[in-house]
Amino acid sequence: MGRVRTKTVKKSSRQVIERYYSKMTLDFHTNKKILEEVAIIPSKRLRNKIAGFSTHLMKRIQKGPVRGISLKLQEEERERRMDFVPDESAIKTDLIEVDKETLDMLSALGMSDLPGVVKQAAEPQAVAALPSYGRGGGGFGRKY
């Protein structure tokens, strides 16, 4: 059964990770020794709790960004994603292919002369239903 971690343990381990991220590892014993060197912690029990939570957070950081911890590497990655500009726009409107029904609706609204709107070349075919087996539990045509 898990234990409740106090605010002191959580805050101190977050601060230690932010400041000494390059030294911290995924190993509890190594993190405990690092905490001994870099922080003044009054008791052995509290030091072990902080080292344990720091190890837990380091494992979570490996998987992705963790709320409450601001690392330079993560901030740079986030900025890179925000500044990304695609080569080709996703909302390119040079040519829009619509079916006959949509074209009729546009003409009813008086918007049939929009630039770039063209009728689709071929009508989409209706998909034939596959035979179902058993009691029809959504098996997508599986026999077994």
UniProtKB/Swiss-Prot annotation:
Pfam families: Ribosomal_S17e. One of its GO terms (cellular component) is ribosome. Gene3D superfamilies: Ribosomal protein S17e-like. The keyword Ribonucleoprotein applies. GO terms for biological process: translation. GO terms for molecular function: structural constituent of ribosome. HAMAP family: Ribosomal_eS17 (MF_00511). Belongs to the eukaryotic ribosomal protein eS17 family. This is Small ribosomal subunit protein eS17.
